[in-house]
Amino acid sequence: MALLKTMPIIRSLTRGKSIRLLQKQSTKRTNPCVYLEAKAVEQTPATEFNSILQEIISTEYNYSVDLKKTLNEIIMPIEGQSMEREAIGICTCFKTLNQLHTKLYQQMISSGSPVYSLSQSLPAFRDVYHMYTINLSGISAIEKIISDPSSCNSQLLIPLQHLLRYPIHLARVCKMLRKYPFLNGDFRMAVKTLDDFRELCSYIDQEKAREESYQVLSALCGNQGVAVDIPRHIKFKGSVIPATSFIYDFNACVFCDDGLVVWTRYVKKIEMKAVSIEQCLRVDELSNSILVCTLNMKGKLLNRHLAPQTMAASVFLKWYHERAGISNGKENKLNRLKVVNAKT
């Protein structure tokens, strides 16, 4: 009975201890957070700079893992199969890409300087990524033979997306070295590497645009005798509204920066079929329409009237004004040279 009488007292005492213990634990849990915040405030330039370098290395490691995953899931299972030439090309390029980044990650670890490793690997980057870009058409060929084509496109485009990260990382490195010259890093090398990678990304983007333009024009023109092997940048691909008094059998167009115009019924690449392939000669802005004078493949002159204040019309006008400005600039320069020569 005595024991039973003392039980409530023991329970109350233990309950009080439990509450005090929980209070102590809660304060202990908040202490590390406070310490981390204080530490973050007191972070030195050297530790911040080293964290950026480590981030570059860890990003390269994750990228290498993604490449190996794609290699094992997509490339290797179809290697022994009969494939189109485009599919073989993209597979070969991807394997070379995987080797490049595996070696690059190892160099970053051994040298401890990811910026130096990137600067040394730049020539290989140019060759490998250029070849990979011009073989992108092989992705659609691979999608036809793999069991799960839904993930193929996204996984095989990862290299071009990852390439854009290098200038971002290098810009952060340059910013730190410019702000804190005492840091252990070669500022000139970092700036040059950043400029080279920016130039490479711009070049690859242009190559990708050329390749996409080539694929669209190839699908449209087929075997109609158009020299689609000439690099052309597509300026406009979209709906066209003919002027109200004129009716044509097309409702969209592909317009290239060299003046090639392909009239088509649909905008989507799969449904695109060329109605007429023409070369743009002149563009005039009339009161009720935009007049586009063209020459078709049979040598016949045509007048296309587009509705004003539309996307297609504005693109035609902009292209024509830019081209006219360039030609006028060349003529003025030649005239000035003639005047100078006459005076001398």
From Swiss-Prot:
Q: Where are the transmembrane segments?
A: none
Cellular localisation = Cytoplasm; Nucleus
Q: Which GO terms describe its cellular component?
A: cell division site; cytoplasm; nucleus
Question: Known InterPro entries for this protein?
Answer: DBL_dom_sf, DH_dom
User: Its Gene Ontology biological processes?
Assistant: meiotic cell cycle
- Residues forming the DH domain are 48-207
Give an example GO molecular function.
Answer: guanyl-nucleotide exchange factor activity
PROSITE patterns tied to this protein:
DH_2 (PS50010)
Q: Indicate the secretion signal residues.
A: none
| Domain of life of the source | Eukaryota
Keyword list (alphabetical) reads: Cytoplasm, Meiosis, Nucleus
What is this protein for, i.e. what is its function?
A: Has a role in meiosis.
Name of this protein = Meiotically up-regulated gene 10 protein
Q: Which source organism?
A: Schizosaccharomyces pombe (strain 972 / ATCC 24843) (Fission yeast)
Q: Which gene encodes it?
A: mug10
